[in-house]
């Protein structure tokens, strides 16, 4: 199942050396798969994830029929990091589904046995050893025995990796001696499952072509890491891109074919990158999409056509090499001409995010010395342009943001020689880290390759350093009071507006000027008024505005109890009115109170995450927990003061303590779920329920790999 295809030699050796009796589920079977489909919670999740349910059900039945006097459990490790086998990569994450699907299994399936999922970090051997010793200690294995088992397991895994790499090299060498074609059949480790890949490797071999896997490039630093715009964050993705680069540089007797599962989030990003690599070297890129279909006739036909085509093209190897050299040279010249001046001297365009953040961003950035303009919110043209210039399988927020930037640059409103774009980079396992690559490709395709794209890190997810040249370093510490107060202010105004707009007095419901009612008018007034205190760097004046706003909103509000609907979900989708098709407004028009999503918890969760990363063995840190908690207490003190001031509005819903919210979510998902909204999404729901909100809408884009876990 999922990551077990990659590390089974390690786990089998570890458990057997520690005295466990290891039982393995049977080979994947379509009949058992169909029997377990009823517990699958997402129709558009990838086939390998759906298949997990049948394996878990079989293991549960197997253990239930065994002896009752022994300790039994189903082992499904929560592997966040794979080994970092190439120092040129940024990180070695698994995708959220591979890491965290055990959380979904426990929620979706009624099992007789426990599913045990220790958090695992294969990237750092010392931390891994500590994790293993702590895990085995719970089963009565002392440290000495655990260390011995760990050493044997590491040796077994190393031997396995070396063996499959050498086997691929041997097959290639023999293939060349025999003058035969070789196909590098690339995919995730779970694509070795015959049911998942529909025996593609055997199908190709039966046509007289030798097959090797992407394992041939494992740990080989003499192979290029891959010419790509992407942040190299996912372990499997890194290997696929590297294998594509290696294959592109080989003679025309080696070709690249990639298997991908429908709904694979990372592949929607990397397939275009590998296609570009192949095109530069004059080689075809073949992508085979596979799913749980039983009729694979069309797949066989495509494979046969591919092999026949490659056999004919092999004679044109010299011509392809010439095209390759020309393409690489042109690309290199374009990169040398890229803009390198400090972005601070340019007009900076930022994407629209939420109506409660947009008015705060320009004055905050002016305080830092930046000239930032927030673009208008997305519209139908944004969606159309995003679909045109980004892969159609990327997540919906990426489509809109790409479209927004392209639309702005093509509008003719800006001096292209004096404009930059800025985009946040969240880090972690979510695809949002690589939105910048999509934006870069899209604006280049429209002739704006000289426009710099600036990235701002908004999280400290497990210590990434992206090493970008065009970065803006936000002075978080120096400006912390005004930044925190400004962001919290936006959330406070949102709480007041949504608490008031469905309870307006009769006279307050009348349209006035351009506003539909007085609640909208007050919202606009107080979101505009905050600019001056921000520019003066006066957090205390912002606090005064909160007190004033509370009285103003209260004055237009009737005493009225109405049902409430909370909104949670993917961060862009739940905030952007166009992205969620104005859902919040429609709920308000039906007479319900909307309990709005808040922005500040997304940042404040980092205090919990940093402590959790250290305690779970995902990150080394010498900073004591009390230091982080003390820093948070300064913010919490500000939040409590805001609560006191804003409580003059009778329907104000106060901020809650982020550590208390995290504690409430502990039994729902692992704290290692730090992708997307992570554990914050279930904690938001729990917090709303505790406030008496019994209706919650969870908004997620189709195919969101983070929300496949946390929202389900």
Regions found by a protein language model. Name each.
Residues 1-712:
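An N-terminal assembly and electron-transfer interface module characteristic of large anaerobic redox
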């Amino acid at each position: 199942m999922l990551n077990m295809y990659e590390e089974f030699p390690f786990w089998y050796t570890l458990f057997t050396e520690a005295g466990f009796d290891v039982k393995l589920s049977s080979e994947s079977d379509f009949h058992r798969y169909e029997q377990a489909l009823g517990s699958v919670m997402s129709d558009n999740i990838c086939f390998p994830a759906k298949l997990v349910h049948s394996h878990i059900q079989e293991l549960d039945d197997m253990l239930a029929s065994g002896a009752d006097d022994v300790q039994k459990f189903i082992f499904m490790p929560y592997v966040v990091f794979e080994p970092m086998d190439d120092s040129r990569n940024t990180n070695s994450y698994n995708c959220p589904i591979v890491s965290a699907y055990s959380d979904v299994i426990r929620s979706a399936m009624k099992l007789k046995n426990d599913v045990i999922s220790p958090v695992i970090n294969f990237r750092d051997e010392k931390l891994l050893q500590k994790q293993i010793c702590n895990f085995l200690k719970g089963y009565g294995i002392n440290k000495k025995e655990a260390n011995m088992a760990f050493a044997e397991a590491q040796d077994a895994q190393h031997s396995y990796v070396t063996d499959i790499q050498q086997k691929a090299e041997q097959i290639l060498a023999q293939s060349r001696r025999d003058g035969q074609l070789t196909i590098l059949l690339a995919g995730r480790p779970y694509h070795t499952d015959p049911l998942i890949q529909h025996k593609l490797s055997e199908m190709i071999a039966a046509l007289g072509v030798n097959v090797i896997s992407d394992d041939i490039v494992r740990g080989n630093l003499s192979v290029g890491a891959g010419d790509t715009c992407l942040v190299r964050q996912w372990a499997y993705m890194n290997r696929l891109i590297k294998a594509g680069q290696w294959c592109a540089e080989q003679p025309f007797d080696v070709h690249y074919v990639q298997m991908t599962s429908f709904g694979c989030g990372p592949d929607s990003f990397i397939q275009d990158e590998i296609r570009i690599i192949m095109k530069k070297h004059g080689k075809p890129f073949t992508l085979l999409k596979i799913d749980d279909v039983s009729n694979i006739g069309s797949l066989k036909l495509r494979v046969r056509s591919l092999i026949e085509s490659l056999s004919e093209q092999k004679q044109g190897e010299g011509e392809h090499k010439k095209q390759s050299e020309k393409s690489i040279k042109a690309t290199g010249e374009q990169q040398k001409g890229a803009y390198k001046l400090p972005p601070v001297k340019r007009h900076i365009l930022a994407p629209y995010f939420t109506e409660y953040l947009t008015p705060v961003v320009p004055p905050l950035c002016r305080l830092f010395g930046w000239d930032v303009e927030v673009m208008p919110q997305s519209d139908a043209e944004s969606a159309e342009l995003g679909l045109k210039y980004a892969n159609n399988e990327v997540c919906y927020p990426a489509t809109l943001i790409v479209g927004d930037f392209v639309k702005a640059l093509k509008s003719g409103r800006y001096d292209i020689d004096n404009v930059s774009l800025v985009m946040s980079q969240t880090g972690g396992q979510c695809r949002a880290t690589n939105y910048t690559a999509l934006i870069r490709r899209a604006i280049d395709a429209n002739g704006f390759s000289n426009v710099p794209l600036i990235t701002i890190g908004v999280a400290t997810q497990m210590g990434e350093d992206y090493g970008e040249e065009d970065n803006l370093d936000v002075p978080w510490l120096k400006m912390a009071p005004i930044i925190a107060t400004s962001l919290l202010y936006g959330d406070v105004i949102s709480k007041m507006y949504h608490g008031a707009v469905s309870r307006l007095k009769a006279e307050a419901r009348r349209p006035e000027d351009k506003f539909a009612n007085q609640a909208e008018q007050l919202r606009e007034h107080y979101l505009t008024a905050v600019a001056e205190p921000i520019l003066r760097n006066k957090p205390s004046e912002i606090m005064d505005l909160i007190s004033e706003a509370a009285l103003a909103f209260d004055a237009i509000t009737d005493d009225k109890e109405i049902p409430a609907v909370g909104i949670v979900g993917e961060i862009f989708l739940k905030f952007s009115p166009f992205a969620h098709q104005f859902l919040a407004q429609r709920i308000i028009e039906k007479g319900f109170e909307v309990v709005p999503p808040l922005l500040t918890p997304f940042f404040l969760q980092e205090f919990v995450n940093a402590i959790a990363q250290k305690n779970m063995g995902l990150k080394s840190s010498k900073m004591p927990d009390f230091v982080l908690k003390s820093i948070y207490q300064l913010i919490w003190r500000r939040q409590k003061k805001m609560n006191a001031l804003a409580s003059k509005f009778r329907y104000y819903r106060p901020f809650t303590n982020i550590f208390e919210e995290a504690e409430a979510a502990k039994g729902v998902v692992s704290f290692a779920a730090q992708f997307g909204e992570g554990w914050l999404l279930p904690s938001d729901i729990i917090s709303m329920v505790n406030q008496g909100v019994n209706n919650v809408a969870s908004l997620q884009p189709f195919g969101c790999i983070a929300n496949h876990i946390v929202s389900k």
